[in-house]
Design a protein with these regions (language model features):
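Membrane-proximal soluble regions of multi-pass membrane proteins
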Residues: 35-98, 155, 159-164
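Hydrophobic core segments of alpha-helical transmembrane domains in multi-pass membrane proteins
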Residues: 119, 127-138
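Residue-level signature of transmembrane alpha-helical entry/exit and packing/kink sites
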Residues: 7, 11-19, 97, 127, ...
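Transmembrane alpha-helical segments and their cytosolic interface motifs
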Residues: 94-127
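N-terminal signal-anchor transmembrane alpha helix
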Residues: 10-51
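Juxtamembrane membrane-interface segments at transmembrane alpha-helix termini
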Residues: 140-152
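Short, strongly hydrophobic alpha-helical membrane anchors
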Residues: 1-7
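Hydrophobic, lipid-facing residues on alpha-helical transmembrane segments of integral membrane proteins
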Residues: 13, 17, 21, 25, ...
Length: 164
């Protein structure tokens, strides 16, 4: 429900500025959380039966065709970021750390997604729905990629196979 009526220019400016602030604010808060606080066995992160050991992501979403094109924001964070584009190692410790980082990244994108309904407060209804669509289009592929990678890494660790 629209509570604030602004001229179109200011509404668009507010939309762009607020999305930037939300993205950066959530990311900067999330990188402050120690990695040990994330548990891949937690209800949010653990593999669900419907994911079919990650096969759902390839069978339905064809993740292998587009995952490599996703942006990696880690380089923007300097030492606080964990680069996910190029695998830096294949040993067990690195894969476990990478799994924890997939939890952080997934939660980051879920939190960003939760902000989308706020845009109904100053946008028309159709633009509010457009903001929800934008948030879903921006964040859901990144969430899917984190879940897919975590399932894959868990399988590699379980099988004792360091091959990607």
């Amino acid at each position: 429900m629209r509570l604030l009526h602004l001229p179109t220019f200011w509404t668009v400016l507010l939309d762009f500025a607020l999305w930037f602030i939300i993205h950066m604010g959530v990311v900067l808060l999330m990188v402050r959380i120690p990695t040990e606080r994330f548990d891949p066995a937690c209800w949010l992160y653990r593999e669900k039966r419907w994911e079919k050991e990650g096969r759902l992501y390839q069978g339905v979403f064809r993740i292998k065709t587009w995952k490599r094109h996703l942006p990696d924001g880690a380089p923007l964070l300097g030492n606080a970021g964990f680069p996910k584009k190029n695998h830096q190692g294949r040993d067990e410790a690195y894969l476990r750390e990478f799994m924890l980082e997939t939890c952080r990244t997934e939660l980051t994108h879920w939190i960003i997604l939760l902000f989308a309904p706020l845009f109904f407060l100053w946008n028309t209804t159709w633009v509010g729905f457009l903001m929800i669509f934008y948030a879903a289009a921006e964040n859901l592929p990144l969430i899917v990629a984190q879940r897919y990678n975590r399932i894959r890494f868990r399988r590699i660790l379980r099988n004792g196979n360091g091959a990607f």
